Amino acid sequence: LLKLFSGRQFSEFFTYPGLEKIQNRNSVCISVKVEHNVGSSMYDVCSMEYWESAIEYITRTVENPLFFICSDNVEYVLRNLIDATKYDYVVQDKNVPVYVSLAVMSECKHFIIGNTTFGWWAQYMSQNPNKIVVAPSKWMAVDMPIDLYENNWHLIEV
């Protein structure tokens, strides 16, 4: 499955803005779904404190990170989560198909994911054996067994 979905099969992959930076730096994909299931408290897990803790952990652990911001609301992320004066970043190109963005996300070295499958798939598709994945300790606000976590992930209590 991973070989079938390599980004290299899509022409848009090679011209994706910031791809070279993402491939050659300590890139960290931060996948934030701002409008995540609006009206459903079951998925209301990742607070502002979660994102702040996740970013702080990455900046302590990864030297000179380049954040690749993937979100349904990039402006919100830049205004509230990533200090654009302090960190280098690249933003998701909304003019290319989402499957190309997913392939580019998987090129990142490390990942901060929320409780969405989009970020989960990006880290899963990553070929970096030394990747750091930061995730919320719960996937849903209700107690329900979820088998999505890897043993080596850094979980932040939510």
Q: What are these language model-derived features?
A:
Residues 1-62:
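Secretory-pathway luminal glycosyltransferase catalytic domains
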Residues 6, 11-15, 68, 119, ...:
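Compositionally biased, low-structure terminal segments
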Residues 29, 89, 133, 153-155:
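Conserved beta-strand scaffold positions in the cores of enzyme catalytic domains, especially
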Residues 32-34, 138, 158:
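Active-site donor-binding loop signature of nucleotide-sugar glycosyltransferases
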Residues 42, 81, 145-147:
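Short aromatic-enriched loop/helix-cap "lid" or pocket-rim segments at secondary-structure transitions
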Residues 52-54, 95-98, 152-153:
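Short amphipathic alpha-helical segments, especially helix-boundary/capping motifs
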Residues 61-143:
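Donor-binding and catalytic core of enzymes assembling or modifying cell-surface/extracellular glycoconjugates
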Residues 141-158:
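Leloir-type glycosyltransferase catalytic cores
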